[in-house]
């Protein structure tokens, strides 16, 4: 329970974005064995203990709640004098909330700034008027106008001496209560415990590449600390690569343009500068005026403490490197929430998040971030049932089809972890989503176009429509209609799981009705494809994917449809790779995934250290919806999939095409599984190690299937 008081600057004016400083000096007779700290701030804090950065937060939250962070400061404290020093970003009352910002992705409440509770054993320290505070003289904050400039905001750092004054007590902190609220009135400053681990921090090197350039081995996120000497000004620019848009080729080709978000630093003597918000960069360029010189850079990478198997080998160096950059992509897009990209929006989008979860599940058994994401999107729901396409954020944005991916998140979490209670607590929101779409079905039986952004994928043929399918003068969304069928049927399974058979039957009836309308209005017998609209003019791979996955088409007919889809001009991009691959796999055409996998492998020749947003002319160099290799190498090459965590069922079916060996750990709903296989002289050998109690269906390359509960399995067959 967090017991403390909010403090603020006595002269705080919230007409501008401003960083406020807080400090407290105290003495300990001995270094404590443990020193638990609770801390929260409005809107963001960075905490330093005895000059060392200890934490930043608070964890991003929805408008319904605010988190406080808990960590142990024992390693930072010492016998004798200690200092807690906190930088807190206060947002202007008239802040431009149209900026899609993670800074704005936390609740602003009453302009209260900082609350701390530190138990050092011999003393308990809380924020009160014995703390000192100052308005920072060092930095001006400029938020970006739009997406294109990236990295959130720039700072302009100046010299100056803080004017320290006693802090002002504002209001008590209200956290989890053991007694009922009097009259049911809840304090709007209520805070709840953080649901995810604190972010890790580690130092990574940037090499001096000459001409003011500093280059890291791979794209990274974190806090750079620069030390300058001299008199004049330094401009610090951060970029993901050389080149931009269609100009991008080799990401380290210095003949290409260089542009990026920048910080400006005025130097008069010796100055150490660290931006308030983390920076995303692979390349940093320093430009100076006067006699200013950079004398030191320490870059502390920061992110979610994600673990992953480090002993995997997928049979060739190229795929091992592709695995590595795919994992790096996922890690860069994983902070206090999943995020679409770390350089630009830094926002948790539903489509991106649903895919990131699946990739995350292959690497470890930590579902804390996934559970938080599911909760975040549930809390974003409007009264009419539609979910925000990205959340937390204060700027509402609606991409209707993204609400479907919330259902996907819940279903995949259940398959992987078997948590029926999580399914049950999300059923009401799922029903709300489906009701909203039911209201969009018109007399044709199809979903009509909405007043929002009907984005599906970044197909190049949909460039002029910003990812919306081109449908001519038709006002219907056939692809979204096919998605609706798929997710109605998925939701029916979830409802039935929780004993809501009536809802399940209703969902299936609605799915059958929309499927029949698609068959009648969109099937083109001559092309052997489903059209994206009722005039049979436009066709896409995306439409065939959902008609296959949803069961609108099945069997040999579905296989023929997917074969016909392969040469279509409107192709699935990296964002749709997972669904494209699953549809191909479902009809026995998995070998056709090599076309896109080869595009991903080609990124290695371009010196990419992460997977870009799109295959062609990417804006962002790091979008984890394209980290598909994580899933394919774990679930297909090694062949390990969770069938049902609740029933402790696994399926292990190694895919050997084009390889002679593979090995690695895969995390499942039945714990960690080690698989190793190889082919020598026409003999296939397989070794499996799993935890006790896992029921395994093993499928061999010759089609033989057998089941076993043995923890260790060895088998050999002649091919």
Regions found by a protein language model. Name each.
Residues 1-340, 352, 368-373, 388-392, ...:
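Extracellular/oxidizing-compartment recognition motifs
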Residues 4-7, 122, 460, 707, ...:
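Intrinsically disordered/low-complexity terminal segments and short unstructured peptides
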Residues 104, 271, 704-706, 715-717:
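Hydrophobic transmembrane signal anchors and adjacent membrane-proximal interface regions, especially
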Residues 25-27, 72-74, 215, 274, ...:
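Generic structural detector for well-ordered beta-strands
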Residues 344-345:
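Active-site groove signature of glycoside hydrolases
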Residues 53-55, 242-243, 692-695, 704-705:
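Short, surface-exposed beta-strand-loop junctions and turns on beta-sheet-rich folds
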Residues 348-364, 368-687, 692-704, 711-716:
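Active-site core of glycosidic bond-cleaving carbohydrate-active enzymes
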Residues 162-165, 170-173, 204-206, 445, ...:
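Extended hydrophobic/Leu-rich segments
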């Amino acid at each position: 329970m967090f017991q403390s008081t909010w403090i603020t600057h006595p002269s705080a004016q919230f007409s501008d974005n401003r960083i406020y400083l807080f400090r407290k000096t105290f003495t300990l007779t001995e270094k404590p064995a443990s020193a638990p700290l609770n801390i929260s701030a409005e809107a963001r804090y960075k905490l330093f203990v005895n000059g060392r950065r200890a934490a930043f937060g608070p964890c991003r939250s929805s408008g319904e709640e605010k988190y406080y962070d808990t960590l142990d400061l024992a390693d930072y404290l010492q016998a004798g004098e200690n200092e807690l020093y906190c930088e807190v970003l206060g947002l202007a009352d008239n802040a431009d909330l149209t900026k899609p910002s993670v800074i704005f992705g936390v609740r602003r409440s009453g302009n209260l700034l900082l609350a701390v509770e530190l138990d050092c054993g011999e003393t308990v320290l809380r924020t009160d008027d014995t703390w000192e505070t100052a308005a920072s003289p060092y930095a001006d904050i400029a938020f970006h106008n739009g997406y294109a400039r990236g990295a959130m905001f720039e700072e302009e750092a100046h010299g100056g001496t803080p004017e320290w004054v006693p802090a002002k007590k504002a209001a008590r902190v209200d956290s989890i209560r053991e007694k009922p609220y009097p009259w049911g009135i809840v304090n709007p400053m209520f805070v709840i415990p953080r649901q995810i681990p604190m972010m890790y921090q580690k130092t990574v090197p940037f090499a001096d590449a000459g001409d003011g350039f500093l280059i890291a081995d791979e794209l990274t996120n974190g806090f750079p600390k620069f030390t300058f000497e001299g008199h004049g000004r330094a401009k610090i620019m951060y970029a993901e690569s050389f080149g931009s848009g269609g100009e991008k080729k080799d990401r380290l080709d210095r003949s290409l343009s260089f542009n990026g978000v920048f910080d400006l630093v005025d130097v008069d003597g010796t100055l150490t500068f660290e931006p308030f918000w983390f920076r995303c960069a692979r390349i940093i360029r320093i430009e100076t005026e006067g006699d200013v010189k950079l004398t030191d850079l320490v870059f502390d990478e920061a992110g979610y403490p994600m673990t992953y198997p480090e002993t995997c080998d997928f049979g060739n160096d190229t795929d091992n490197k592709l695995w590595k950059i795919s994992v790096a992509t996922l890690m860069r897009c994983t902070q206090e929430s999943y995020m679409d990209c770390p350089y630009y929006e830094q926002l948790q989008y539903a489509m991106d998040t649903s895919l990131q979860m699946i990739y995350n599940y292959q690497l470890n058994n930590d579902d804390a971030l996934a559970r938080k994401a599911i909760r975040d999107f549930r809390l974003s729901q409007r009264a009419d049932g539609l979910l925000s396409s990205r959340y937390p954020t204060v700027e509402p944005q609606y991409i209707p089809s993204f609400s479907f991916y919330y259902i996907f998140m819940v279903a995949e979490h259940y398959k992987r972890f078997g948590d029926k209670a999580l399914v049950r607590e999300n059923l009401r929101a799922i029903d709300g989503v489906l009701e909203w779409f039911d209201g969009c079905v018109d007399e044709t039986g199809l979903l009509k176009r909405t007043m929002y952004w009907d984005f599906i994928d970044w197909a190049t043929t949909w460039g002029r429509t910003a990812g919306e399918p081109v449908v001519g003068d038709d006002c219907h969304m056939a692809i979204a209609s096919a998605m609706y069928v798929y997710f109605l049927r998925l939701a029916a399974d979830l409802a039935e799981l929780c004993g809501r058979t009536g809802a399940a039957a209703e969902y299936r009836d609605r799915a059958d009705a929309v499927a029949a309308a698609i068959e009648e209005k969109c099937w083109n017998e001559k092309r052997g494809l489903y059209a994206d609209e009722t005039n049979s003019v436009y066709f896409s791979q995306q439409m065939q994917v959902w008609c296959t996955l949803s069961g609108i088409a099945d069997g040999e007919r579905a296989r023929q449809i997917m074969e016909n889809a392969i040469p279509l001009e409107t192709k699935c991009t990296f964002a749709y790779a997972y669904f494209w691959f699953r549809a191909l796999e479902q009809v026995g055409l998995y070998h056709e995934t090599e076309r896109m996998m080869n595009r991903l492998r080609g990124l290695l020749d371009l010196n990419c250290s992460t997977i870009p947003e799109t295959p062609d002319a990417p804006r962002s160099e790091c979008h984890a919806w394209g980290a598909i290799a994580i899933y394919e190498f774990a679930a297909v090459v090694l062949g390990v999939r969770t069938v049902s965590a609740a029933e402790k069922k696994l399926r292990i079916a190694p895919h050997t095409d084009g390889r002679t060996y593979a090995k690695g750990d895969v995390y499942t709903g039945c714990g960690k599984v080690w698989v190793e296989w190889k082919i020598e002289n026409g003999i296939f050998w397989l070794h499996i190690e799993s935890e006790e109690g896992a029921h395994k269906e093993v499928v061999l390359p010759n089609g033989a299937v057998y089941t076993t509960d043995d923890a260790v399995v060895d088998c050999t067959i002649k091919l």
